[in-house]
Structures are given as structure tokens and as C-alpha cells.
Amino acid sequence: MLRVGVIGVQGAVSEHIEAVKRAFERLGVEGEAFWLRRPEQLNAIDAIILPGGESTTISRLMQKNGLFEPVKKLGEEGLPIMGTCAGLILLAKEVEGAVEGQRFLELLDVRVNRNAYGRQVDSFEAPLKLSFSDEPFPGVFIRAPKIVELLNDKVKPIAWHGDEVVGVEQGNIIGLAFHPELTDDARLHEYFLRKAL
């Protein structure tokens, strides 16, 4: 049985839990998706999702709740972790526009610009190309970060908006600038969960 924790300190948690449940069904696997708030919940976990929200707040609360270092260590050891929007920022090695003193997990060798797509009013939806599917994916961008640079060839693009890379993977780590959990399309959650099977 797969156990998937969604970091539940702030952000779009319930939508990710529902998307993971849809992905379990599509994959035909038994699984449990839950809000991850305390370090002891990391025992016997198979995958972690870092949701959207506000990256500075999520980073601070993860540190306060004792989740930051254990999650970083699990990611370094190969546990599958997916970050969406603010979660991508937390995973990034380098962040433009970071708040002073903000800590990052630094599990993805990318440079991101924190609020490249502007304010809430600059949010948009657009069809995205995926590396593993011919069908376009409905991309929902809300004050999204931008992937400015892939820092080495270990980082592979998996999603594009036109010519722009908006999703990447590096080993078992996935970072997405958009919100797949705000659609009914579970393909990206399914792709992520395959890393934990």
C-alpha cells in the first residue's frame, strides 16, 4: 500500500489529496494520501508532495514543525518528492527574488524566479505539452514561479508552455510551476506515483 503525504502546513492540500486518490484509481493500486504535519508521520512514507501556497511561509512552518531537515534528507536519499508552484520554489537550488533568510530544500538543480508571472490577476490557464503523453495537459498558473535555468543535464524537462519549460524532473524529484491538482486530469500525479511503485 502506497502512503503519500502532502505537506499540510499551508497551501492547496485537499486538492492534492483528491488528485492522488484519482491517480491511485488509474494505477489500480491501494494507497493512502494524508496531510503531513509532523516528523513522526514520515515513518514508512512512500512519497511527498509540496503544495502551492506561499513559499516563505511553508519553509518557515516546515522548520518550526521539524519537517524541513527530515524531508530534505529523504529527498537526498531518493524518496519521490513533487513540488507544485511554491513547492517548486522550495525544491530549487537557486531562487531569484527570495526573501532574506528563506531556506530551500535545494533538491532540484534549477534556478527559478519566485513570482515571475506576477500577481493573482496575472494568473492564467494554458494547454501544456508533456514529455510522456501526446494529449495536452490543462496548465493552471497562479502567481507562478518561472524556471529560469536548468543548472545541469541531470534535470530533464517534462512539461512545456510553448517553448518555455514549466515542469522538470531530476531522479525522483519533480518540480512544476503550475497546479495540476486544480484540474481533473491526474496524469502528472500518476506519473509521479509511478516513481514510488
From Swiss-Prot:
SUPFAM superfamilies found in the cross-reference section: Class I glutamine amidotransferase-like
Gene Ontology biological process terms in this record: glutamine catabolic process; pyridoxal phosphate biosynthetic process; pyridoxine metabolic process
Positions with a binding annotation for L-glutamine: G53, E54, S55, R114, I142, R143
HAMAP family (alphabetical): PdxT
Record-linked Gene3D superfamilies: 3.40.50.880
Protein name in the entry: Pyridoxal 5'-phosphate synthase subunit PdxT
Organism: Thermococcus onnurineus (strain NA1)
Family assignment from sequence similarity: Belongs to the glutaminase PdxT/SNO family.
